[in-house]
Amino acid sequence: MIKLYANDSYKSFSLIFELDSREIDYELHSQDEASALGYNKLPVLVIDNKILDYKKAMRYAKKG
């Protein structure tokens, strides 16, 4: 399962848009949940316990 930890930033919005346009399924989690897990720099995409920062997450989303 893919988990997206996002906030209200432009980067989060653009990543959500890219994931949705490629029809990639993900669970959306809040900034509070991210902070509780120690993710301070959002957005963060977690795939099979592998943490992807914004740049890597966008690459993943664009590959579909």
Question: Language-model features: where?
Answer:
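A short acidic, often aromatic-flanked loop/helix-cap motif at beta-alpha or helix-coil junctions
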Residues: 33-36, 59
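Short secondary-structure boundary/hinge segments and terminal tails
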Residues: 36-37, 52
